[in-house]
Every structure is written in structure tokens, then in C-alpha cells.
């Protein structure tokens, strides 16, 4: 068995090095990886209605049909194939989409074997990361800046553009023809990439493919943004669209660097712009600078033209607003953040003269947004839209221990997530709602009133953990740049990675 696994990983590694992916689509072990490894759960078991053995038989039949000529496209109207699709009408596209997702990730993956010493070190540092590392970053960096722009990364992007971009990463023409055919025939592309309120609203069958395509698109756009950041002093806005037309784009970049190195490195004098800070989180980004708003407008135009000419995505200029930090505020990862000016007067005396000196200091405030949180709690049936706690009837059939444990788990998760807030009054209100919801659920189960239930059981000892402060929270750990991203961090491009995010945080 170990020899077979070694052979599988060897074939995958060879395909990655040679950028030849087409044969992997017809390998059964690719779909075995989907089934047997930790890829956000198995698509076979999540769709129910059949056991694992029968689903693996479907995979073998699927591979056989793919090997046969003129059997790639399966029509739902074909009566001979209805029996094959009788388990689940979406099963075929689910299996293939998961297999495609694994194959296209191969040329972009840094290593395949997760048991190496380096990956253990990386995994260890990932466990040290916390959402609380964001706030020292903002206090140390953004509070000293004057202008900030907070906007959403525009999408959807056209399928054909993504396929063309991916061709620069792997030189396998048959695979990309098959990839294009598959996306057009089997995936409902409009549902796959149409913008929603949150990524979590996408169906589970398409989530892995969507996340790969979206992250690949963001990676491509940020790599170009970094090039712009380093060479912006040599680019004029009028020539920007010519440079970023898609035809021979990478050749233009190489030619630009070549010309600059030969002709301009010693003779051209220019004004070097100060740093632009760039932060990406979820589906949004932040641009911040200490300089005048003119520089921020320049970068705003650069990004709009980059999306327009390179990705054929239109972004409304009026949706990207540039605000002063002292006047603007923004939502970040479930928090409401703004910079407040603290003014203080200091008396200074020199000999017989005294002076009053006004000192202005910036302070970052991170507030728990109570209204969106109550809306999320109401949607989860813990309270009504006004924030009044209600019972959770679907949990009333569980034991008392499991009911209390479920509520406490949610409460602890929210406490871990929102303990970085500078004002915790809203957090205490959320915990109060969960506490009363738990009491009402227990009273409903025992067919009693809340008052009688508390008097009989005693509320202080039973539910004291709801208001117990966390003694130790893993926080204030900001991940340093890895060897592959040192250039990004030196260029003021920040990646704030979050290991855990509670579902209730996605308010939008």
C-alpha cells in the first residue's frame, strides 16, 4: 500500500514539474484523493442516498466513460444514461469538479507530502496565529497614516479570462481545452461565480472550485499590483492601458524591466513615492498612505484600469472612496473600526513664561457591531429581531449537558473572536442573550417556566461560565513573512491570515 502511495505522489510530482496535467484527469487515484483525504469532507458522503462502495463504483464507471471517445458530454435527456445519473443528478459534475480542482492546484502547490519537517514547522506557526494579531498591526501601522480607501475586490470575472491566465502557470493545451469544455457544459457558471453577500452562500458542490478560481484571480491581480508598486515611478497613467492589455502582457513586463536595467538605471532621476500600505481581508482590500490624497487617487485609477484592461472587470470609481482616517471608519472582519483623535493640553514653563501645548494622538477603536450580531443571532433563532432571547426548540430533545455545552461553545467562540475589542459592552449583551436563550431552552424541555426552573436548579452555579472571562487567549502573534513572501512584506503588502472565524461574524 505504501509503495502504491509513493508511486501516486511520484506521478503527481512529475506532472507538476513538467506542467502536463491532462493525463491526471483520467487517473482513478485523483478521485480517490477527493474521497480519502481531508478536502473539506467527502462529496460522496455529503450527498447521502448511497453508501461509499456504490459511490466508488460510480467513480470507476465515470473514468471508463471519460476514456471512451465521444462520451465526455453526457446529456440528461439520454435515456441510456439516466440509470447512471439516478443516484444524484448533480453527482457527475460534483465528482469531476472536485477532481479538476485537485489537478489545477498541483502546479501552484509548494509541496505534496505534508509529513516533511518544513510543513510541520509551518503548521506549528499557523496554530499560533490569531485574529488578535490584526489589532497590533493596525495600531502600529495604520494609525500613523492619514488617508485610507476601503473597497471590495470586483468580480465576477469571465471564465475565459481565468483560463487564459492559468495557461501562464501550466503549458498543457489539451488540459485547458478540457477545462474550458467542462466549465461550460457541467458547471452552472452563473451560480458558481456570481457575486453573493458572502462566499459561504455558495453551494457545497461548487465551493472548492469557486474558492480556487477566486483565490487564483486574486493572486494574479496582486502579483501585478506588486509589480506596479515597485515600478510605479516609471509608469505614466496615459500609457497604463497599453501596458496592461492582455496580449503579450508578460512579455511587455520583461521588456520593461530589461529596458529599465540597461538604459535608465544610472541616468534616470525620479521622485520615489513613499509606501502605500495594502491589506486584503475576505473579499475586500484596504489602501492606506501618509501622503496627500492625490497619490491615493493615482493608485485608485491604477487599480481600476488594471481590472478593466487585464481582467475585463468593471469597477465603479464612485464606490472606491478615499477618506481621512480621523473622519472615516470601516468594517473589518466583523469589527467596526475607526481612528479617534485624543486631544490633550500640556503646560510647559520656561523661566517666567508658560505655554499651553496641544497634543493630538490617534487611537484605534475596535467596536463589536451589536446590530449585525443581533441580526445574526435572530437568524439562528436565539432571539427575535429586537434582541429579546427566545428558546431554541430544535435543541430541546437533547440532554441538559449537550444543550448547555452547545450554548457555551458558541459563547466561548464569540469571546475568543471579540476579545480584541476596545469596548466590550456589546459583547456582554450578546452573552446575556445566549444565557437567557439557554435557560429558556432548558425550561421548555422540562415543561416549566423560567422562574420556576431557575429556583429549582439554581442559576448561578449552572450558568456562571457564560460571564467568566477567558484567562488565557492565544493572541498578539503576528506571523512573519515566509521565505517566499519576503518581497511582499518588504513592499508593504500585508496578508492577515485568520485561522478561526465564527459563522456569526459574517454579518453581511
From Swiss-Prot:
Keywords: Chloroplast, mRNA processing, Plastid, RNA-binding, tRNA processing. Signal peptide: none annotated. Its main location: plastid. It comes from the Eukaryota. One of its GO terms (cellular component) is chloroplast. Usually encoded in the trnK tRNA gene intron. Probably assists in splicing its own and other chloroplast group II introns. HAMAP family: MatK. Belongs to the intron maturase 2 family. MatK subfamily. This is Maturase K. It comes from Lupinus cosentinii.
